[in-house]
Amino acid sequence: MKLTLFLLTICVLTAAPDPRFAFRELDGGRLELRENGAPVFVYNYGPQLKLGVPEDRHRSSYLSPVYTPAGAIVTDDFPADHYHHRGLFWAWPVVETQGKVYDHWMNMTALARTVKTPAVQESPQSASLQADNVWVADGKEIVREALRLTAYPAQKDSRELEVELTLTATSAPVTLRGSREQGKSYGGFSARFAPRQGTIVRADGEVLIKDEDLVPRRWAELEGIYNGKRAVLRITPDPADLNAPYQWCLRNYGFVGASFPGRTASSDGYTLEPGKPLTLKFRVKVTDLP
């Protein structure tokens, strides 16, 4: 009896624990992260296009769906009102290089492509994903995009993600600009939210009754009820980022975007130079609410 208990104890102590985080490959160039068996997000590294959507809306290098710890899906992809919106994404409507103008936002004349399958690491403390992408325009690589994404364990009702994005022009300067529409400058790190009820948009602790553009904010979030589950997603740019605090594009229909480089009297674009990388960092927090 004592020997049996001893052997059982040894087996329990030496058994490899199940990892808290685990990535798994899905079809169509997608990587899913799970925490203790529950989905966290899907990173779409291969080209994605929904049936019935125009060909020029295909895209890659973005997160969707994104889940709360309780399983609420808070992001949307290919929404009918803005096919080009795509979960958590980073894109610019105006990309200029060598006298030509391309679109990395909607019509995708500058398209992000994956160089190789993303590298992943898993541990009880975090899970990380590193992806090397290139922006291709007219068959030429114009920007190298290095993505590092880190997910941390859920703490009660919340989970945090860190996104680090490094952009480098390849052989010629590339200028990034926001929207050319008057009074707007969307373009940068953005989130499109899933259909929901009870929408509340906040920025720096202020509830916004109306949509807002070009106002500098330290953070912004959108709260809503998703299939009966109330949740909120907040985006906080790193205060050390260039041009922080950012101007924002905030929409009650379900869009929150940190505009980089924004539009001011002295600045209306940012030029990437070959050999001089630009790094932008963001923290994304998803929280289940009572």
Model-predicted segments: where are they?
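Sec-dependent N-terminal signal peptides
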Residues: L3-L13
